[in-house]
């Protein structure tokens, strides 16, 4: 079959935005390889928003009359309605979301008017901008979900009150701590994740629109006006960097991977705590599953999936970094591969976080079991050593004396508190009966009242500070969203 020699026909048939310098159309194999609509179609709302801003910029520069501008904006509104309703979807012939939407616009506005929209912009600056818009919107969604998770953990910490649990290092009994202190220890990494999202947004708040393919545009379009219209604070300082940089995507993928790691660490503990051997927690029926063969099973699937999906998030980051590491400036087609990993990370967390928060909010803690295990494993040994230090024994000697005491108790199969006064004196004359004052988990916890310690008074202060910090971060996020919306509304008015 003879291929058409009309380049506009070839481009239209292929759903591509190029073709004039080619004698023939692309091979079916190349078309299949190049097609990206199966993942970039979700950028369609952002593409249309960008087209509106671009149409206004073209009109301001004199490339569209007032009537053409109005007709173009109406056509874009119709295009958006068709996308939302599903009346317009990407076809097999469409190379990417840009080509599919241009095809849809041509059907609505006609080729004469619709064909004017492409002036002064490239897919290179388009896609760099649209990805930022998508990520910024989803950063706000994930931010709100993380706040809900921190709120759920903080509520559990408040409900725990003075409940004591065994604190561990190396997964071995270490020192008794408040359950609330332990739960709050999982809140602070998530707060830092919230801060990272806010920090990231400050760097993402730059519009590459106007950078063209790499060198900018000769048409005199106001890139700053487009940036404001799309909710950005400013335009890219360098057009090459604007089209080629993907560090903002990689950084976002890192933040999401770090969130995944923080969830995975908590998940590992919940999985352990849910075993018979620990017996610290009971999962809600609504947030656990059973076995297809073992009727007694109640499995911590959400925690296990969170632990598993953290590897997926790390893999997405690693793959993205590997793609970026050897690219010369400016744009390269390799950058098509930036979207699937980060889109997958976004979608993974947006499904995972609500389920994870529900699991946390409905956990029931067996505080009696925790209190029973808290003094085991000679977890009060450090209290004995520090008591000796307070009585003017050098810590090196205190450490040695306490170690001998532990050895004696261990050999008899008893706890430190079960040793007699004679046993204490036999180990060291410094171990007088008054040392028993520290051989209780309540006394141990209460004595650790330095800043950041596990004493109840410090934990209550810590929780109050956490609530304050989260409220501040929530307010900052809300204010940033309002500023973006106001700037966009003002620019498009």
From Swiss-Prot:
Gene expressing this chain: argH
Protein name, UniProt field: Argininosuccinate lyase
Pathway as given in its UniProt record: Amino-acid biosynthesis; L-arginine biosynthesis; L-arginine from L-ornithine and carbamoyl phosphate: step 3/3
Top-level division of the source organism's lineage: Bacteria
Naturally occurring in which organism (per UniProt): Clavibacter sepedonicus (Clavibacter michiganensis subsp. sepedonicus)
Family: Belongs to the lyase 1 family. Argininosuccinate lyase subfamily.
Catalytic activity: 2-(N(omega)-L-arginino)succinate = fumarate + L-arginine
Swiss-Prot/TrEMBL keywords: Amino-acid biosynthesis, Arginine biosynthesis, Cytoplasm, Lyase
Compartments reported by the entry: Cytoplasm
The protein's enzyme class: lyase
Lineage: Bacteria, Bacillati, Actinomycetota, Actinomycetes, Micrococcales
Any Pfam family matching the protein: ASL_C2
